[in-house]
């Protein structure tokens, strides 16, 4: 089942077909998706994004087979406070800000250094909230935070524009800053990662 409780949450569907030889193939992009209940939508790549509270059903069809998955959505339209470890740091990584070619390099970039790929949350939170008199994370006026102004290229930024005002990533950072730019050290951390299918068939390289 799919149970999502925040507007920024989503679910990635993966459909695996078992072949005659015993190997597996990822057929997610070949599946026909339908959503009942008007609670969200599914992209051709199987990414489910919620749009309304309620219960529904996600149906996948492939090669004459059919599978239904119950869906329950809540929290749409309600305020939420993004978590630094779970929500903000992954966005910073996705945008490339803490990469080795940017602020995650040994000496940082333009006087601003982050831990490489966000491995040290305490170091990063201090870099965002303590340095430069907290100008990088302006809790009084989040939109004036250098963290957002640089990323959206509202002010000169050597790395160019990596997000836009109003975008999902921009809003996650803005809401986090507006809620006080805090770090919760008790946030659950990722313990392991699994790849599916485990024995894939590669048709082209």
Describe each PLM feature range:
Residues 1-205:
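Aromatic- and Gly/Pro-enriched helix-to-coil junctions and flexible linker segments
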């Amino acid at each position: 089942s799919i149970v999502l409780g925040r507007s920024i949450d989503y679910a990635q569907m993966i459909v695996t077909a078992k072949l005659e030889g015993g190997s597996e193939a990822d057929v997610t992009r070949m599946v026909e998706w339908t959503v009942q209940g008007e609670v969200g939508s599914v992209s051709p790549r199987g990414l489910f994004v919620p749009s309304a509270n309620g219960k529904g059903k996600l149906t996948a069809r492939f090669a004459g087979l059919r599978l239904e998955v119950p869906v329950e959505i809540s929290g749409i339209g309600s305020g939420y406070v993004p978590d630094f470890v779970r929500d903000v740091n992954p966005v910073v990584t996705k945008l490339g800000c803490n990469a080795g070619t940017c602020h995650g390099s040994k000496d940082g970039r333009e006087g601003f250094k982050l831990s490489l790929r966000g491995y040290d949350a305490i170091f990063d939170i201090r870099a965002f909230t303590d340095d430069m008199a907290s100008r990088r994370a302006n809790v009084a006026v989040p939109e004036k935070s250098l963290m957002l102004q640089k990323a959206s290229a509202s002010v000169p930024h050597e790395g160019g524009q990596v997000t836009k005002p109003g975008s999902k990533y921009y809003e996650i950072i803005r809401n986090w800053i507006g809620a006080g730019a805090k770090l919760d050290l008790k946030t659950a951390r990722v313990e392991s990662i699994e790849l599916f299918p485990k024995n894939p068939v590669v048709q082209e390289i």
